[in-house]
Amino acid sequence: VQITLDGMKKTHNEVKHLASGEDVFERVISNIELLNDLAPEINVTIRVNLTLKNKHEYAELYKFCQNRFGERRNIGLTPAFVLDRSISNCDVCIENGILFTHENRSKFILDLAHKGFDSPFIRYPEPFFNECAVRNDMAIAFDPEGYTYKCWEVIGNKEYAIGKLDKDGILANINEKILNRQLYGADTFEDPVCSKCKYLPICNGGCPIQRIQNKFEKAHNDCCTPYKGFTPDFLKIHIARKKALEVAATEKQQ
């Protein structure tokens, strides 16, 4: 289960708020605890939406969750970088310091690692490879109106809807063009540039929905892995951590 936060309490409640004025941040945290109490076997990933304006809150939120959730198992945090996903790739947002670029995203991940914060991005190399839910025929997401999507980042944009639930809860009015485009239209190995790139398959092909926008909607998304251009830095951290684990294991045996 993936649950989203937009920063610490003040920031989150400014982004997501109720007319009643209820503390939405505390409601989310309490619901995570409730879910963990009722079904501790379910893995909960707290996805923290980050821009250049709130990136400094990630470390604080990480420590907050460590203290709040204590010894609870199967609850983890991961940064989710807000990139420009518009077709026009609005330069104003980048110039105003709102959105992450490839370079400052990679540097932020490395900075977290140097400060001792773990993240899925720093676990290099991955023990296995997998693809995004967009290309998984069993994955699906819904909006409040019953429209269905393959990608949770475009929920609410009906141009990407593959169908809609009818009154009986059955998926109907399937848009086969959109469905097939999202399932098969982002094959990395059909991209002449990517298929020759040395970072494939480490990158897993990048974000499929971005690739689809580039291919069919004339967007200019940067789909490359955070490792690109920074592989030596990631490897140094990986090697240092591996050595530290080996030393700790040796000391434990003595």
Segments (PLM) and residue ranges:
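Short beta->alpha junction loops/turns
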Residues: 5, 51-54, 200
